[in-house]
Amino acid sequence: MSFCLRLAGIFCALLMLFGCGPDRNAFAPVCPTAHLIPALADVTRYAGPGPTHDVTDLILQARVTAVNGSCAAGDDSALLPAKVQVTLLIQRGPAMQGREADVPVFLAVTDGDTVRDKHVFAVHVAFPPNVDRLTITSPDIDLDLPVSANKSGASYGVIAGFQLTPDELTANRRSGG
């Protein structure tokens, strides 16, 4: 009988230890809002120079279709760790040499109208045989946002788009992007 009482005592002590830890009534941190700017959400690449192109000159077309992320309370209360992924729809064109390409994408963190940080990275796409259209999601992009009692993650915005050349940006604006 004393063995059972000792076992019950150990069990109760373990239950109390498992109850220790972060405040269970604390709310999850608020993440920044993601934005897509139409003029930066599309890219069309052509072979050869010139302002006009035929469909046979098309290397690839791509569109940012989603920006997703998550936040979690970190060890440092002055920083909010966030993970962001960018989802792209990519179409291979007839002028594409090979079946692989790197598409330059950017992620910018804004604070009001100010860009606080910008990260440019390449999303690699490899088209399998007989597949000319893919939806892919970038690897996680880790962000650490400075927060305080007066400034939450909701104070920030995240903008994703393609790192365009001046000609590509002009073409997007002309086409209504």
Predicted regions and their residues:
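Bacterial N-terminal signal peptides that target proteins for export
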Residues: 1-9
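C-terminal motif of bacterial Sec signal peptides marking the signal peptidase cleavage site
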Residues: 15-19
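Bacterial signal peptide processing site
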Residues: 21-25
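Post-signal peptide N-terminal segment of mature Sec-exported envelope proteins
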Residues: 27-51
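Helix-rich interaction surfaces within compact, conserved domain-sized segments
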Residues: 28-30, 116-177
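Short, solvent-exposed beta-strand/turn "edge" segments of beta-rich domains on protein surfaces
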Residues: 53-60, 68-82, 92-99, 149-151
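Beta-strand elements of well-folded, non-transmembrane domains
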Residues: 66-71, 84-94, 107-113, 125-129, ...
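A short, structured loop/turn motif at beta-sheet edges
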Residues: 76-79, 109-116, 150-154
